[in-house]
Amino acid sequence: MILSLSNGIFSKLSLVGNFAAVKQLGFRNIEFNMKSIKKEHDTDVYREQKALAASGLNCLTLHSAVLHVKDPIEVHQAVYYGKISLECARALHTSLMTVHSNVSKKLPRQIRERCLKEVFGEIKPFAKSLGIKLSLENLSYTSTGFGKNVEQLEEVLGVIDPEGEMGITFDLCHALETKETDNLLEKYGRRVCNVHMANKAHKPFTKETPELKSFLIKLNGYNYVGPITLELVHNTSMEEIAKTKALFEKIFRKY
């Protein structure tokens, strides 16, 4: 399997410092998180393109800037975030972008459906024109967004992706917290095209736990080869990241 690191963990650093920290740890692949940009709506995507090229890193995926719309008046802002993220994905030469549902879990169903249609009615055609695949992430129970389990994801996908073209970004941390790991894998295992890897609360795995082993075995059964993207809490130390990297490299030799 292919190992990658979300550079969102170094979002407080400059872009050059961010990429340097990733390289210092020995990673070759990253998921570029739009949180790494000081202002997520910044349109200067060529700065990111230049910094990535200078680093020599490969950008396998990009995590979109996110706004969980809680009122229809915010739809235009969510669309803007999505389109700027897609522009950045194109500049970084990645063909896969992770997205959230972009709607608040507090919205009534009728308004939620309306907002979903309006947001993705703009984002999906733009992504298609750029040759970028969208991948919907399962959310945590603490998230303000809608889409934490199969029932909610099915509602979202039924509105925005009836053709079944979008992928799934499987966030193991979120699935463990919502106790939806098996249900999500059973439903979406063949659509997974990115995995956000972390233990509960986005803490690093320190060993191959029974839950992790079971997940990887089942994922391997779907012939998934990566990326496995380490997405870790911001206070994870460089030493802890290095140990987690070594752990997964050891585990991957078995698959």
What name fits each language-model region?
Residues I30, L60-L62, M97, L134, ...:
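Hydrophobic residues within beta-strands of alpha/beta enzymes
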